Amino acid sequence: MALSILNQFYLSCNAMAVVELYTDGASSGNPGPGGYGAILKFGQHEKELSGGYRRTTNNRMELMAVIKGLEALTKSGLDVVVTSDSKYVVDAIDKGWLFGWEKKGFKDKKNPDLWRRLLVLLRKHHVKFKWVRGHNEHPMNERCDELAVAASKVYNLPEDTGYGE
């Protein structure tokens, strides 16, 4: 039985190599229709992921891009470098805010449903975050933006059930 391209991609990953995850989120209005785009890269292998919701925010889509990218990894304990143009996401991790928010039960914080999902994934892998300036000719960031914007324009998008929590 032939392996799907996605399975071939993930079976080739091992804990000794670094998986690169590029992400971006977009929304038309805040809230409004939004989308996320992610690119997983390992050696010569590359996989694009995208999706959207009809009523969401740009920050939720930035988070969703990272979450969907990490959820796509079928092995645990991988070294992953996430490259994002979202200060919201990168600073929450790199400055340790997320772990403080968790200790306080995410009291008065937006998007607790997504932050909780991200925490589970951060504990499953060895993840480092890298910030890049958005819309600054970074090819992978630009491609993720294209994926996110296209996903936000799909007809009959599903509801973002966590929005508004």
Where would I find each of the regions flagged by the language model?
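N-terminal amphipathic/basic-hydrophobic helices that include classical n-h-c signal peptides
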Residues: 1-15
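RNase H catalytic domain
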Residues: 20-33, 67-143, 147, 152
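RNase H-like nuclease fold core
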Residues: 11, 15-64, 70-78, 150, ...
